[in-house]
Amino acid sequence: MDDISEMTMPRIQDLSASLRNLRRPWPNQWPGLPLVFDRVLQELGLGNPRKGSAVHRLLGFGRAVSELVEQDGVKRHAQGQEPAYHNRLHIADTLVCMTYLLKTSAALNVAGARKPAVVAMALCIMAGHDFLHPGGSKMHPGELEARAVHDLQPLMAAAGLTLAERQIVKDCIMATAPAQVKGIHLQIRTRPYDLRQTDCLAVLVTEADIMASTLPQTASSLTQSLAIEWASQEPEAAEKLLLPQNRLLFLEHAALFSSPAACRLGLNAVKLRQVKRIEHELQNA
């Protein structure tokens, strides 16, 4: 495929509106994660890749992942066992957030941002980054991410991903482990940003993963959902999630945004406004 054509600069208000639209049908009228996946790839100009191309096999992998996540989510939801946070809606959130980061990157002429294979890879990673997540957090650091990578291997093989492509998927998913996020942002801060480099793409993946939890329009409901998910295994940690002090810790140490796209969208300004408001409330409590 040729490079993706020029794109208009997205606005963070439009991202918030897109996330609201995802929530309207959830969960009873949910159209399905495969439809969300197809819509974002159409929005990014990936609708008709050449058969046998890297884009074609990557999107085949992404669709297969989306279908399996949807099937698993429907089954677990019917049993009352779908995680309250790490569910199909979270995957859809991250696909939409990644779409806005990619569109902004393209509008900024970030290196690699208009390469169809890079864009397809980014979408596939978001579709699979929490593959068949069991819910909860009582695991060793990186265990859930490693499990997702392991469980994705047969799907990557079936789709014909090369060893190099599988390694990119692995590296980017492992970068979303909370203990790894700060390091990956520091790793690329002194270099020109190029999405063809795995660590730069990994930064975008970590940003898309927590963006909906950062935006004030969706943060509260997502924090409550995560607390519900944790409650059975770690009730004390679940209660602490809802405290303003914990929100402050999340904004200052976990919600990291350093890519050109995230900076242009104004994510750090969004964070700063929340931090100042919470600090003011705590001082006057």
For every predicted segment, state its role.
Residues D2-G47, Y85-H86, C97-V118, G128, ...:
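Divalent metal-dependent phosphate-bond-processing catalytic cores, especially two-metal-ion Mg2+/Mn2+ enzymes
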Residues R50-H56:
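Low-complexity, highly charged intrinsically disordered N-terminal segments
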Residues G62-G73, A122-M126, V169-A177, L204-A208:
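Short alpha-helical scaffolding segments that buttress acidic/His motifs in well-ordered protein cores
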Residues A64-V96, L132-G135:
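Active-site flanking loop/helix segments enriched in acidic
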Residues G80-Y85, M121, S137-G142, A159:
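Short, charged/polar micro-motifs that form catalytic or ligand-binding hotspots
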Residues I91, M98, E145-H185, Q245-F250:
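Histidine- and acidic-residue-rich, metal-dependent catalytic cores
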Residues T94, V119-G136, A148, D171-A177:
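His-Asp-centered metal-binding catalytic motifs of divalent-metal-dependent phosphohydrolases/nucleases
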Residues S105-G112, K138-M139, L155-R166:
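Inter-helical turn/loop segments and adjacent helix faces that build the functional surface
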